[in-house]
């Protein structure tokens, strides 16, 4: 099963069905509150751990629950107090509040998720750090995300330029079939900036 937390209201069950996703195994939760998400994950992992330990006591071969959590996107999350600050015209304090709750969030959920082998995948916004000697892309949300993540991948995209392998393949297929195939899509570059499990290797793929 997959718990999909949508903080940007960009998903609905109908659109997910069109992509061929089994919505019977998907739980869609739409919220932008980091406190609410923390409570959802904490309560969920506590209940799953209780059930798992009970089953394990009677059956040593009991498997851990198969679940994946996806948050899209972490950069769009805010805090309950942050919403109140916007309403009262004090939004300037919001970033510091969010960074504090972000650190608390990871401290609360990292260990329970690890004990149950539940992966949590986050998408995030990036910004260019102008303070460094060479401007580099950094993830929003403070350092807590960088410290707690096992893998961080920076994605960038580029248009097909007609000289890449994908364009060459489409051109060859056009000639073989005798019809014109318009090149579309983009080339995505995946650059792992942190990984605890393997040597980071930059790669590219076509969408």
Which residues fall in each region the model found?
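Phosphate-binding/switch region of NTP-binding enzymes
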Residues: 95-207
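Conserved inter-motif catalytic segment of the P-loop NTP-binding fold
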Residues: 2-100, 104
């Amino acid at each position: 099963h997959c718990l999909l937390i949508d903080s940007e209201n960009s998903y609905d069950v109908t659109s997910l069905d069109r992509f061929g996703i089994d919505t019977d195994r998907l739980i869609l939760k739409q919220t932008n509150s980091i406190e609410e998400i923390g409570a959802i994950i904490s309560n969920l992992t506590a209940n799953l751990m209780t059930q798992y330990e009970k089953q394990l006591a009677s059956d040593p071969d009991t498997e851990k629950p198969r679940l994946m959590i996806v948050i899209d996107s972490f950069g769009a999350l805010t805090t309950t107090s942050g919403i109140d600050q916007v309403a009262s015209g004090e939004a300037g304090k919001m970033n510091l509040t969010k960074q504090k709750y972000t650190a608390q969030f990871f401290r609360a959920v990292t260990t329970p998720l690890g004990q149950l082998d539940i992966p949590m995948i986050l998408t995030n916004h990036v910004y260019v750090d102008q303070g460094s000697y060479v401007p580099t892309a950094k993830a929003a949300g403070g350092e807590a995300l960088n410290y707690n993540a096992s893998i961080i991948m920076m994605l960038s995209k580029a248009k097909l330029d007609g000289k890449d392998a994908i364009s060459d393949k489409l051109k060859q297929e056009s000639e073989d079939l005798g019809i014109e195939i318009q090149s579309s899509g983009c080339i995505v570059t995946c650059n792992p900036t942190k990984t605890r499990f393997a040597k980071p290797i930059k790669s590219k793929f076509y969408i």
